[in-house]
């Protein structure tokens, strides 16, 4: 440990700590622009200057490592004068257009100029002006405001892993740019907006829409993937204005994927705002009483075993639990969250989770991707993997091509024989698995989305057992889930085995839109959802429900952590919350569902399933070796790129996401997208 004195206070810090970090530990506020705790140190804004005894000049505290016996002063006339001088230089070419800047009210430059600036300006010459750069449909630039802190450049290189930002020219003429002025290729590019300390990079969809003090903030969870990223929904009235990340060190740190951040405008379009009943082949509007009575009458006329319910990718745990309880009351035990027919083993919780945990990736030293594409399925999780690779602490190999990652990766091939050889210790990569202290295997839908998924999964379990990848001190087997509802559905047993879809007489769809509807031609379809997607067009009765921003709900992320998405705005039109709809349908059938409100549902959930008594936490889970007698096919393993920006009913109806798709297609046609070409190591 190193001892130093800061403003008369003696503190101890570990070796390698910077003076800035030591000052922060001592409770001192040091102004800064270029420094960011998750980025490499640049030391180019000079706003963090402090006085060090025996030094003739003030030092940049963010770049100076501590030394024994250092005496630091953070509030002397020298420091005050230095900060005023730095701020004056930073504002020399700044346009000072705060009234029309989207960053106004939440701008570091604005706040620090007020606190540390001189209040007067000696510069009377003409200011420089820089042409705004094009960075795609998500980021709006005003580069004249840029103070060259280089945070965006370091984020692109160190976190996103795509070196597409940089600086050109020197001195006063320096410009931050994306070189070719093309759409940024990263799936987490929107984070550059958050870390920009001025108004140079702003959200294009949010531009000129609102001020910070007009907005109501609601804590929620990102539901467009299975990561469970913590988000903050900013709303004005009953309109969602923007979505920002919340800090959670165990999941998303402070980053957020572009889909979770920008797809909120899809909540405005193609919404179901009133019940509909199909009459004479056409859907016509109806009252709630009429729609619920029609469903109740239909249920009474059908044998319970001929009724099946499917939950969609955005269904909350409470909604699925309420629907399951309702179905059991009418004698039906057919319900499933797995509308994609993924071949997963759900007999033990550890068999379908990301057992290493997201934060646990920081400990892994070898990663084997099998049919997995984490860049598009879990972009924030992927940034953790990339950071470890670039730090030289993790090696990544993959079985299954068809995608490109943002870090160095070793291609082992795509033949199923590779897995068989690994299981028998006959492949050269086996030596690396044996040598690794903390190896992990990540299995994607390129495996469990196949018809022979169970057979491949059985083979992977043999590899896990062979190389001791799941043990008391290390959990290295991981399933990479695609959808927010899957783990929660599995946790409450909403995954009963199904018979032939052709035999179903009534299908109750809880936001399910990805079913093989050609097999449900003879079924009476009830669709409970919030968007007019495929399921709604096939339905005989539509019950309009609330989106995730319009009702409170629990979602369990891929590592098995239950979290609550709070209600931010009211449902549109005559739409109702999911549990209210199911409760009214139960009342129509004169059923006692034993629960009448959200709190009662959560209390019952916690009693029946211990995981829901630990909101925000991960519990220990059992893992059991899985074996299958299914035969392997001869098809190679692939993990093809997907339409990342459109994977659910909200993102599919987002104008912003549509613009992203168009921009990516244009880049791909020009051969500029990293997703359109493969790199091999």
Swiss-Prot record:
It is an enzyme of class 7 (translocase). Its cofactor is [2Fe-2S] cluster; [4Fe-4S] cluster. GO terms for biological process: ATP synthesis coupled electron transport. Pfam families: Fer2_4, Fer4_NDSU1, Fer4_Nqo3, Molybdopterin, NADH-G_4Fe-4S_3, NADH_dhqG_C. Keywords: 2Fe-2S, 4Fe-4S, Iron, Iron-sulfur, Metal-binding, NAD, Quinone, Translocase. SUPFAM superfamilies: 2Fe-2S ferredoxin-like (SSF54292), 4Fe-4S ferredoxins (SSF54862), Formate dehydrogenase/DMSO reductase, domains 1-3 (SSF53706). InterPro entries: 2Fe-2S_ferredoxin-like_sf (IPR036010), 2Fe-2S_ferredoxin-type (IPR001041), Mopterin_OxRdtase (IPR006656), Mopterin_OxRdtase_4Fe-4S_dom (IPR006963), NADH_UbQ_OxRdtase_75kDa_su_CS (IPR000283), NADH_UbQ_OxRdtase_ferredoxin (IPR054351), NADH_UbQ_OxRdtase_Gsu (IPR010228), NADH_UbQ_OxRdtase_Gsu_4Fe4S-bd (IPR019574). GO terms for molecular function: 2 iron, 2 sulfur cluster binding; 4 iron, 4 sulfur cluster binding; metal ion binding; NADH dehydrogenase (ubiquinone) activity; quinone binding. One of its GO terms (cellular component) is membrane. The keyword NAD applies. Binds 1 [2Fe-2S] cluster per subunit. Binds 2 [4Fe-4S] clusters per subunit. Belongs to the complex I 75 kDa subunit family. NDH-1 shuttles electrons from NADH, via FMN and iron-sulfur (Fe-S) centers, to quinones in the respiratory chain. Couples the redox reaction to proton translocation (for every two electrons transferred, four hydrogen ions are translocated across the cytoplasmic membrane), and thus conserves the redox energy in a proton gradient. This is NADH-quinone oxidoreductase subunit G.
